[in-house]
Amino acid sequence: MPIHLPPISRRQFVVRSLLGCAGLALSPELFAASKRTDANGWALLADIHLAADPSLIARGINMTDHLSRVSQELLMLPKRPAGVFIVGDCAYNSGQIADYARVADMLEPIRQGQMPVHLALGNHDNRERFWEALQQEKAAKRPLADRQVALIRTARANWFVLDSLERTLSTPGLLGQEQLDWLAGSLDANRHKPALVLIHHNPGTIANVGGLKDTEALFAVIRPRRQVKAYIFGHTHVWKVDRDPSGIHLINLPPVAYVFREGEPAGWVHASLERKGMRLDLRCLDTAHKAHGQVVNLEWRA
């Protein structure tokens, strides 16, 4: 399964805080841990691009600062989300072990706030170094030995996290037949609840070789299985919501790190699962951005 960072227990957190003289009364992590959980609320992040050096600037952006601001926003929500998904490109460039140590360190406040974090891989990640750096935190057993895949069951939907990393620093992605077979079998075994598929890479086309190479094979699996309601991805560093002709929602998450085109928003999405759909609330890091607070209401296909 993808690296799963469980919440840090309240006891662990209090002990760590006391040892570090953290000032419990003012701690946003403790404040978040004391809140009720929104069982249907989820934080959707992509492309955090963290580097070992917290002062590193890329495209005019400090990536560590951006994730820190998102983390603080999550901790200050009226109700804490049930969990956080980070849909690939966790590392800055080539997925070094020290990058993933920084990732683990930066995600600790979220875990202290009692929110589990699910991490998937993108083309700027390195699977082996990822596993090595986070060895103590990951689940002991994965459904596929050499891929980061998971099924996360929740009250109103099942989340399927896939691994589209083909080669580090190679832009396109690939799922491969073994992973597609696992997805098909897992969907068939879980027919009676909406399914949401999370993959780092965007749907690819002949004209767009930078996306998912086996997009058509993926759609051959998910289109006829009517419980699949959405395909959620990052990679393009663009915020966009579209719909496949079959009715599957295509949700392109904004980057937490930097944008490729001036004017695009950086930030995250607060997703709220409803009985027959999902509400998406865009949270821009630049709160003056015209898209900040944009709400998209999705209705599930029948």
State what each model feature region is.
Residues 1-7, 12-32:
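N-terminal export signals
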Residues 34, 96-184, 189, 194, ...:
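Extended active-site neighborhood of metal-dependent phosphoesterases/phosphodiesterases
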Residues 190-206:
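Short acidic, glycine-rich surface-loop motifs adjacent to enzyme active sites
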Residues 18, 53, 95-96, 128-129, ...:
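Short N-terminal helix/helix-N-cap motif within the alpha/beta-hydrolase-1
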Residues 48-51, 90-93, 123-127, 165-168, ...:
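Solvent-exposed loop/turn segments at secondary-structure junctions
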Residues 32-100, 192:
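N-terminal active-site segment of His-dependent metallophosphoesterases
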Residues 36, 272-302:
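A short C-terminal boundary segment appended to hydrolase-like catalytic domains
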